[in-house]
Amino acid sequence: MSTHHTKEPILEIRSLSKHFGGVKAVDDVSLTVNRGDVVGIIGPNGSGKTTLINCITGFLKPTKGTVSFHGKDITGKKPHKIADMGINRTFQIMRPYFSMPAYKNLVIPLSSPRAKRVGGWRGGGKHGDRDTVAVDILEELGFERDSRVPYKMAGTLPTGYLKRLELGRCLALRPELIICDEVFSGLSASEISSLVPLIEKLNGQGITMIMIEHRLAELFRVANRVMALSYGEKVTEGEPDEVINHPKVREAYLGSEEDF
Amino acid sequence: MFYDILVYGFIQSAALILMAFGFSLVYGVSRLPNFAHGAIYVFTGFIAWALFNTVGLPYWLSVLLSILASGGIGVLIYYVILRRVRGMEVSEVIATYAIGLVFLEGLRYAGFRGGTYTLPVASDGVSFIFDVPVDHQRVLLMILGFAMVALIWLLTKYTRMGRALKGMAQDERAAMMLGIDSDATAAVAVALGSMLAGVAALIIFPLGSLVVEEGYKVLIYAIAVCVVGGLGSWAGTVIAAFVLGYSQYMTVAYGKPHFQMVVMLLAIIATLIVRPSGFFGKQKQLEERV
Amino acid sequence: MTTETTQKRRERIDRGIKVRSESLYALNSFEEIAYLLTPRVLLIAAFVLMPLILSPWPYWGRVGLSVCILALLSISFDFLANYVGLVSLGGAFFYGVGGYMAAVLNTELGLPPVLSIPVATLLGAGFCTLALLPCLPLRGIYFAIVTLMYPLLMTRIIEAFDILGGTEGFRGIDGFSGFFTEQYGLILAMFIALFGLRRFVNMDGGLVIRAVKDNDQSVRASGISVTRTKAKAVFLASLTGCFAGAYYIHMYSNVGISSFALDLSIMPIAATIIGGAGTLVGPVLGAAILVPLSEFLRDFGSLRIVVYALVLTGFVVFRSEGLMNYMTRKYQQVERWVKI
């Protein structure tokens, strides 16, 4: 559980809407994320969580509303520009470079302008060093350094490692804000319980996080604030306990109460 | 002059519809870019010529047989080549284009060149439309151009095969789950598309002479019409044929005929850059670029 | 399973010598060093000796150079198609732009070949990259179609506006000072392109380019501009193509709209697919097969193109891995049938 409460807003979403034809995938959603927060976004399938993320990270252009980062308007900027500013995301459908070894997957973000500018990884940006840095990051994420896992083709890795690889891409960019799109889904209970401390560790390093999740129990271990969406609209927002006891949230999640 | 442009631009547009509709049909139904389209067009013309002049069959029979032959070539191209590379778009393009080259350059090697080979026109008469003289072959071209569009439209609406084609065009997987044979339908589509190319050849060739170069030209015209109209969109194909047909005729009327091709090439490049899904298509933008 | 038929599957195992010579231990024995170096040495030796062998027959010397020209164009195609994911059907565009650029520099500004070729290569590559820039977001078939149109448009524009010498083109362009200059200049350039690109694709910058082909969304999410990355790759490919065009027109002292001809777009594709796509060496091999073949078929006119097109179709449909990948496999692995 995060303890930083400096209340310095870094990401502000104001009445954001995204319509596909007549469908309001996201409708008038506002959210403020403070530095050091771990904000959970919950909601049933099709409630617009991923669309919201796509709008924040520039993969979709919002129909209405604004997104600002450190007070700077970033609405509708190109995805690579937003990533370059320090907002980095994982994909729900994992997108590794299947034909490259795991560690080479991280050489790509390490070659990005942001990594060169912000740097900070041991060894810095020179050619050759990136491989070492990549393995360092993978080790931090639980790829055993001396095993062959970091050197295996990404296409042959199991889901748990691919999820970590997605996080690794974010870490390589030295992010300020990581947006995770369902990192826990598709993982076994033991895999999740090894990921949770990792998320806490990253948050402890000062990285702000937004997490879209279906696995509420695990999410509530790490999140300090939660927003619930339903049919693209914001239902409620607040401390995890408040949100979960909100009647509309209970209604939306009825039938899956064993999760709590 | 105004009526000239109106009438002959219309004829040019109808010719473009004839040239492009087969290509559009095949892509629309099975997402197969048939780059052998122009070659089939020329080849059908030569088959008809050979059946009529060398074999000595009556003209109507030569026409019928050559159209059937073009359908046969379409089926062969599908089963021998396209079926094996289906899904790999670039291989489809390269393989069909190469097969087209085989036909066209094979004909050139066989000695078909220059303006010596012609097909007879259906009738020598001349009619007047808005006081503009139009020969009967061109009248036939206009009528058949639209008759074909109407025929295909009726086919897709009222026959089982046609509905299968339409189903494939919308969602191949769903259609396959409903028991539609993807291979057979695609083969039918390629065959139909090739026959349309054949029909177009037999109507348009009598206006000029049979030359191999027409094959390359027709392919580019077909691509231009389909790209501007939106690849795979049939309504778009018709609208785009008019836009391009009139602009082509204008360049001929007011400028040099040289610019006819420039218009088409620029139309392709500009459309793909500005709006790759075409100006009249309803495909999603995301499919072809991010 | 209770079926009587025994099923078999083909098993491929790396040869011992291949595994041993992968690491530094290869230096332990001459056999392993030889295993490692033979293919490379053979390739280099073949091209270095070629001019010496062919010097009594200048005509065949030129044929040898045509192999190198086609190899350059094919390397450019292979790099774009299989490392960047941009399948260009318009290789003639690079070639023609390079050729015309060199012709103008040489005849109008009087630059000698030593200058006109590199300057034309650079300027031409810049021009091609700018011209293709708006098409870079296009994918697959759309990029293929648009690139197919570029060289056609160039010829039609030159014809219609009667610029750059119109249908006549330029004549009287300076040639090279001697047989061996001409030969080794081109062979050296081909090696630079081949080994340079092969090295580049394994460096970090090359890795980013390959990542775009694998998964461009992730590249975006990594804060890297996909369009800029593609533009860099197109620049490299057009450098290679423009150089080929610039060099060729100095060899034959003239340039015309045939520099944008379709053959020049099709031949590199054929050479790449026959030789082995995605290897960069394969295209050289393909060129070394196709060019002599085309010389033997020269008397048969357009039958040449028929033969190419048939071979190309055959390879695309039935043997899409190409010769190089096939040979590499045979060289590095043993195959056997195993019952399952």
Regions found by a protein language model. Name each.
Chain A
Residues L219-R221:
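A short, surface-exposed alpha-helical micro-motif characterized by mixed small hydrophobic
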Residues T57:
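Helix-to-loop junction immediately C-terminal to a conserved catalytic motif
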Residues R174:
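Conserved catalytic motifs of ABC-family nucleotide-binding domains
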Residues G65-K72, M85, L138, Y151:
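Conserved ABC transporter NBD signature motif
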Residues I42-P44:
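The feature captures the beta-strand-to-loop junction immediately N-terminal to the Walker
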Residues I178-D181:
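Catalytic Walker B motif of ABC-type/P-loop ATPase nucleotide-binding domains
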